[in-house]
From Swiss-Prot:
Its EC number is 2.7.7.56. Phosphorolytic 3'-5' exoribonuclease that plays an important role in tRNA 3'-end maturation. Removes nucleotide residues following the 3'-CCA terminus of tRNAs; can also add nucleotides to the ends of RNA molecules by using nucleoside diphosphates as substrates, but this may not be physiologically important. Probably plays a role in initiation of 16S rRNA degradation (leading to ribosome degradation) during starvation. It catalyses: tRNA(n+1) + phosphate = tRNA(n) + a ribonucleoside 5'-diphosphate. This is Ribonuclease PH.
Length: 243
């Protein structure tokens, strides 16, 4: 799809922003990635602990969980830290649960063994698509953490069953577009976040009409756009991992 819609960035309707995945961005975490979707920048780390939550004790399997947050000046105006307010927002809780679900969809938790991978996604700069960037970058960080577990002899095979990535799509000025930045996201008629595996399976679809209902044909067009964009992101993951 190459609609002639005029986007603020000048991109085609089916074009991603410039995407970069920088591995080993910090030195302490077992996996760390700086993911950039245009001007959106998120630091994703994967940390391994040799224990599992109480509800999984003695079950012989592992767990993967995620936390998400934004630096106070990640947006146009400063926001108080949620720790200072003493409570996470509903948006934060929703996004971190989404990140955890997305990655668990491509993990064999029994093969991981009785340990937990903690994913932390910290938004350094926000310009739309922070949750989709977080999922895409967190997968690479988790992959690096798993590689260290294998190298240390703690597991004998990778528990990762497939790649997973995510992208936003929406209806902007009446046309379906891929990978919305903030200027588009704040003005779009429909906003959708799509999470898919490398094999093309859907993990999650979150879609909302912003006042104007969308048709089945528009939804199908958005999903087609998302599928193409996610295929590009999965290929980028493979390229940076050397897979």
């Amino acid at each position: 799809m190459t609609s002639s819609v005029s986007r603020p960035s000048g991109r085609r309707a089916d074009a991603l922003r410039k995407v970069a995945l920088t591995r080993h961005y910090t030195k302490h975490a077992e996996g760390s990635v700086l993911v950039e979707f245009g001007d959106t920048k998120v630091l994703c780390t994967a940390s391994v602990s040799e224990r599992v939550p109480d509800f999984l004790r003695d079950r012989g399997q592992g767990w993967l969980t995620a936390e998400y947050g934004m630096l106070p000046r990640a947006t146009h105006t400063r926001s108080d830290r949620e720790a200072a307010r003493g409570k996470q927002t509903g948006r934060t809780q929703e996004i971190q649960r989404l990140i955890g679900r997305a990655l668990r969809a491509v993990f064999d938790l029994e093969a991981l063994g009785p340990r937990t991978i903690h994913i932390d996604c910290d938004v350094i700069q926000a310009d739309g698509g922070t949750r989709t960037a977080s999922i895409t970058g967190a997968f690479v960080a988790a992959h690096d953490a798993v590689s260290k577990l294998i190298a240390a002899g703690k597991i004998t095979r990778s528990p990762i069953t497939d790649h997973v990535a995510a992208i936003s799509v929406g209806v902007y000025e009446g046309a379906p577009v891929l990978d919305l930045d903030y200027a588009e996201d704040s003005q779009c008629d429909t906003d959708m976040n799509v999470v898919m595996t490398g094999a093309g399976g859907f993990v999650e679809v979150q879609g909302t009409a912003e006042g104007v209902p969308f048709s089945r044909a528009e939804m199908n067009a958005l999903l087609d756009l998302a599928q193409g964009g996610i295929a590009e992101l999965v290929q980028l993951q493979k390229d940076v991992l050397g897979a």
